[in-house]
């Protein structure tokens, strides 16, 4: 079987019923940072403590504007001798132009890697399948491994899965090895798993709209409140210490006559009436017809609240439990 992407689209499946699946991640992009000042420069730009990031760890963090609003979130890790991050392709160009603004004063080269191949490996026996190709795999304790031109990331949520950053040759080997055993799917399957995991999806429609805490990045250990200065730090800190953040990321599931687009609002039932509320970050329809919506809503919303896609008289959406706690450390 020849390797080419994107893989043919299939209706996404929830993690509990997902067979072994290779997923082409064409909706995501890879960026690398190299040069002597790569760590120092990024330390002044993102919410995570880059000085504390080890070579066997990855972190989801935010890149903010001066008002603390996220240009994007980034899945950040070491790759080879440099740093790398993965973000949604829809906002790549704009986010990079912001990130590079002051790079001319530092010894750092920031560039997209359009030839890099991003493949997700998820579902039943994902670890066993990868072990046939790679002698060392990442784990929950050590979620990043490097082998030659390949970097492997491990994710525990919503169920064990892996993200492979590699080249075309290695991708071809993986496809050939697992053809006949694995399903193939496109980016929407990985998107569904991220929604189920409660990982915020920031696309171009929602860039520079939310502080990181409105999308639960603090609950995913993506914000350091003890590191030095970075762009937007004052607003991010104020949200924590002055209780300025009144929003949170939610996972909703139910039925809908259409899949809402990023940036749309939803409707919340109040007695006999419906009130517009919140912002959709991402949404997907599964193989069983269920619609999943990831949205930013008021953080005091009752767990039994009923919502729906805007103007959808026949649909209802219910709040689903996230696989992590939003309780703040005191």
Curated annotation (Swiss-Prot):
Record-listed folate binding positions = 28, 190
Q: Identify the SUPFAM superfamilies for this entry.
A: Aminomethyltransferase beta-barrel domain, Folate-binding domain
What keywords appear on the UniProt entry? Cytoplasm, Folate-binding, tRNA processing
Q: Where in the cell is it found?
A: Cytoplasm
**Any Pfam family the entry gives:** YgfZ_barrel
Q: According to the UniProt record, which cysteines are disulfide-bonded?
A: none
In the record, biological process GO terms are:
iron-sulfur cluster assembly; RNA modification; tRNA processing
Q: What GO molecular function annotation could you give as one example from this UniProt entry?
A: folic acid binding
InterPro entries this protein is in?
GcvT/YgfZ_C, tRNA-modifying_YgfZ, YgfZ/GcvT, YgfZ/GcvT_CS, YgfZ_barrel
Q: Which GO terms describe its cellular component?
A: cytoplasm
Gene3D superfamilies, per database record: 2.40.30.160, 3.30.70.1630, Aminomethyltransferase beta-barrel domains
PANTHER family, per the entry: TRANSFERASE CAF17, MITOCHONDRIAL-RELATED
For this chain, the family text in UniProt reads: Belongs to the tRNA-modifying YgfZ family.
Q: What does this protein do?
A: Folate-binding protein involved in regulating the level of ATP-DnaA and in the modification of some tRNAs. It is probably a key factor in regulatory networks that act via tRNA modification, such as initiation of chromosomal replication.
Q: Which HAMAP family did the record assign?
A: tRNA_modifying_YgfZ (MF_01175)
Task: Report the protein name in the record.
Answer: tRNA-modifying protein YgfZ
């Amino acid at each position: 079987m020849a390797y080419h992407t994107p893989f043919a689209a299939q209706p996404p499946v929830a993690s509990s019923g997902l067979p072994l699946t290779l997923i082409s991640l064409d909706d995501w992009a890879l960026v690398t940072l190299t040069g002597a000042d790569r760590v120092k420069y990024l330390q002044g730009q993102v919410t995570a403590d880059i000085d504390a990031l080890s070579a066997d760890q990855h972190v989801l963090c935010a890149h903010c504007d001066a008002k603390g609003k996220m240009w994007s979130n980034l899945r950040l890790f070491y790759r080879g001798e440099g740093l790398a991050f993965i973000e949604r392709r829809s906002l790549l160009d704009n986010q990079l132009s912001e990130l590079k603004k002051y790079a001319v004063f530092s010894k750092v080269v920031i560039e997209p890697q359009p030839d890099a191949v991003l493949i997700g490996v998820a579902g039943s026996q994902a670890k066993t399948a990868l072990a046939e190709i790679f002698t060392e795999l990442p784990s929950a304790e050590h979620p990043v491994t490097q082998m030659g031109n390949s970097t492997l990331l491990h994710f525990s949520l919503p169920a064990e899965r892996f993200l492979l950053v590699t080249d075309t040759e290695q991708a071809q080997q993986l496809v050939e090895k697992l053809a006949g055993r694995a399903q193939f799917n496109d980016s929407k399957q990985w998107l569904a798993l991220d929604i189920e995991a409660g990982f915020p999806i920031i696309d171009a429609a929602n860039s520079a709209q939310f502080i990181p805490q409105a999308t639960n990045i603090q609950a995913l250990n993506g914000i350091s409140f003890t590191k030095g200065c970075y762009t937007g730090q004052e607003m991010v800190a104020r949200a924590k210490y002055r209780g300025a953040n009144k929003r949170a990321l939610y996972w909703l599931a139910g039925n809908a006559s259409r899949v809402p687009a990023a940036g749309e609002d939803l409707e919340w039932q109040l007695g006999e009436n419906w009130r517009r509320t919140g912002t959709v970050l991402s949404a997907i329809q599964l193989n069983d017809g269920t619609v999943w919506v990831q949205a930013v809503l008021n953080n005091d919303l009752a767990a039994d609240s009923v919502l729906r896609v805007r103007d959808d008289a026949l649909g209802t959406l219910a709040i689903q439990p996230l696989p992590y706690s939003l309780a703040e450390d005191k």
